[in-house]
Amino acid sequence: MISRLTGKLVEKNPPQIVIDVNGVGYEADVSMQTFYNLPPVGESVQLFTQLIIREDAHLLFGFATAEERKTFRQLIKVGGIGAKTALGILSAMTADELAQAVAEEDVKRLSSAPGIGKKTAERMVLELRGKLVAHTVTDGLFAAAPAADETEDIVSTLLALGYSEREAKAAVKGVPEGTDVGEGVRLALKNLLK
């Protein structure tokens, strides 16, 4: 099992990244929360990972924190939620926001994540209740990397999460100018939930 990778970030192409660890390039899918908190290409990075072996593929998923990985592991245990859907959920909300939504039984908020309908959201509440803990302080490992055009990056992230261009552009209007991309995505998603 590959539990953690430490090396040089050599490629960033949402939602995939490549980390060079002693001459071996590891390709991993990451949540948008993690992606926008990665350092620039060429810098050192550390990710917690989850390797999923299927009949047709070996898939590696990367996370900024051990807590995010733990949440991912709980999500993929829920019936109807696969690895890609779990990653989409963690792109739409932080692990703490997910834990809070489950604790509050907020089906509407959960079903706003891409690929999650009302029934799956209800199943998430039932199966995850008591298993996720919200933390008031998150332990991010990376400094936020400023984007050249944050608005475009936020819109493209929302499009990657399955929202329409109209919804994405409307949601970005409520994000204050100068907000970094990671925080901008969170604020835009909150605007979409209103």
Curated annotation (Swiss-Prot):
**Region Domain II: start-end pairs:** 65-143
> Which stretches of sequence are listed as region Flexible linker?
144-147
Report whether Transmembrane helix shows up as a keyword of the record. no
Chief location bin: cytoplasm
Annotated Gene Ontology MF terms? Answer: ATP binding; four-way junction DNA binding; four-way junction helicase activity
Q: Which domain of life is it from?
A: Bacteria
Q: Which GO terms describe its biological process?
A: DNA recombination; DNA repair
User: Keyword DNA repair: yes or no?
Assistant: yes
| Pfam families recorded | HHH_5 (PF14520), RuvA_C (PF07499), RuvA_N (PF01330)
This protein's GO CC annotations: cytoplasm; Holliday junction helicase complex; Holliday junction resolvase complex
Q: Where is this region: Domain I?
A: 1-64
Which keywords are on file for this protein?
Answer: Cytoplasm, DNA damage, DNA recombination, DNA repair, DNA-binding
Q: Which residue ranges does the record annotate as region Domain III?
A: 147-194
Q: Where is it located?
A: Cytoplasm
Cite the NCBIfam families for this sequence. Answer: ruvA
**Main function:** The RuvA-RuvB-RuvC complex processes Holliday junction (HJ) DNA during genetic recombination and DNA repair, while the RuvA-RuvB complex plays an important role in the rescue of blocked DNA replication forks via replication fork reversal (RFR). RuvA specifically binds to HJ cruciform DNA, conferring on it an open structure. The RuvB hexamer acts as an ATP-dependent pump, pulling dsDNA into and through the RuvAB complex. HJ branch migration allows RuvC to scan DNA until it finds its consensus sequence, where it cleaves and resolves the cruciform DNA.
Q: Please give the subunit comment from the record.
A: Homotetramer. Forms an RuvA(8)-RuvB(12)-Holliday junction (HJ) complex. HJ DNA is sandwiched between 2 RuvA tetramers; dsDNA enters through RuvA and exits via RuvB. An RuvB hexamer assembles on each DNA strand where it exits the tetramer. Each RuvB hexamer is contacted by two RuvA subunits (via domain III) on 2 adjacent RuvB subunits; this complex drives branch migration. In the full resolvosome a probable DNA-RuvA(4)-RuvB(12)-RuvC(2) complex forms which resolves the HJ.
Domain text from the record? Has three domains with a flexible linker between the domains II and III and assumes an 'L' shape. Domain III is highly mobile and contacts RuvB.
User: What is the official name of this protein in its record?
Assistant: Holliday junction branch migration complex subunit RuvA
